[in-house]
Structure formats: structure tokens, C-alpha cells
């Protein structure tokens, strides 16, 4: 049962840890008595992956590992890449492979509107190892829509996620930063 709980926690960690970096451009319209004027709000900082810093975190158990690579600039999380591997023969339960496939399918279904628009989600099974590979490019995602799917996202006022808060959450969940 403990392994099942760990498995579930590992599988859904990325879904609950999603952050944001999408920027919204807002337009305002001012109407004069005889003339309409359109103005644009002051642009916010747009982040790019080109000059991002990188940090790698890992969590391991006897039944698998999670490796998460984070890209960030200043205190803004820009992208998350995660590879979760599960050794099927070391998992508890009657049919852990089917359980993993079902859970992964449910997660992929929940994310389907974002796939190809900032989210990639893939699974593979080979030689007793089930692998889930996913990435979230927060510079491309519509973060407001993502917040609708995951209401617990801790978005800041500028629609970004704090890298330092994200990192702290990983460390609190048992991840170790790789040097």
C-alpha cells in the first residue's frame, strides 16, 4: 500500500506543481467625445529560454525515480521537464502496469487541450520499466486556462510561478538537487 501511495504521488506530482510564465497583453480603449483612442498597457517582461538557468532535482525509491529539470530566470520558472521511471516488478498491487497506464491516460486526457501548446506528455513501456516523460513550457502555455484545470496553482499577480517556491516544494517532497 505504501508503494502504491508513493507511485500515485510520483505520478501526479508534476500535475500539481505546474507553474506559469505566460504573459498577457491587455488593451484599453478610451473614448473621447468625437474620437476613439486605443492604447496598450505597459508591456511586462517577456522571458525566453535562451538565457535561462538550469537546475536538476531527483527523487528515488526502490521502485523508480523522478528526475526533474527546471529552467528559470531570476525567480520565474520558465520550463519543467520530468522523467518518471517505474520498475514494474518492484511495484505493489495486482496489476501495477495497468494501474500506471490508466493513471497516465487520465492525466493525458486532463492535459489534452494543452498538448502541443506548451505541454508534452508521453509514456513508454520496455523491459519491465514504465516511463512517463512530460514537459511544461510556461512561456507558451495559456496560464489562465491551466489555472482553470488546476485551481490550486499558486500563480503570482504577473501570471508566473516562483522558482524558489517551486524548488522549496520539491525539496519538501524528498527531491534532492543534483550538482
Task: Give the role of each language-model region.
Residues 26-49:
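Low-complexity, Pro/Thr/Ser/Glu-rich flexible segments characteristic
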Residues 1-19:
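Sec-dependent bacterial lipoprotein signal peptides
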Residues 5, 19-20, 124, 136:
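Intrinsic disorder/low-complexity detector
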Residues 6, 19-32:
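Bacterial lipoprotein signal-peptidase II cleavage site
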Residues 41-179:
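Subset-of-secretome marker
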Amino acid at each position: 500500500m505504501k508503494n502504491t501511495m508513493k507511485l500515485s504521488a510520483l505520478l501526479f506530482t508534476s500535475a500539481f506543481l505546474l507553474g506559469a510564465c505566460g504573459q498577457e497583453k491587455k488593451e484599453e480603449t478610451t473614448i473621447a467625445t468625437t474620437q476613439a483612442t486605443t492604447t496598450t498597457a505597459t508591456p511586462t517582461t517577456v522571458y525566453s529560454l535562451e538565457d535561462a538557468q538550469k537546475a536538476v532535482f531527483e527523487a528515488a525509491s526502490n521502485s523508480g525515480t523522478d528526475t526533474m529539470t527546471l529552467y528559470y530566470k531570476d525567480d520565474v520558472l520558465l520550463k519543467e521537464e520530468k522523467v518518471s521511471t517505474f520498475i514494474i516488478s518492484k511495484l505493489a498491487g495486482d496489476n501495477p502496469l495497468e494501474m500506471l497506464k490508466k493513471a497516465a491516460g487520465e492525466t493525458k486526457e486532463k492535459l489534452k487541450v494543452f498538448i502541443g501548446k506548451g505541454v508534452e506528455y508521453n509514456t513508454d513501456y520496455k523491459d519491465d520499466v514504465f516511463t512517463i516523460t512530460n514537459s511544461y513550457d510556461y512561456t507558451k502555455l495559456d496560464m489562465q486556462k491551466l489555472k482553470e484545470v488546476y485551481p490550486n496553482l499558486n500563480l503570482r499577480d504577473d501570471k508566473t510561478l516562483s522558482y524558489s517556491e517551486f524548488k522549496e516544494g520539491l525539496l519538501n517532497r524528498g527531491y534532492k538537487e543534483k550538482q
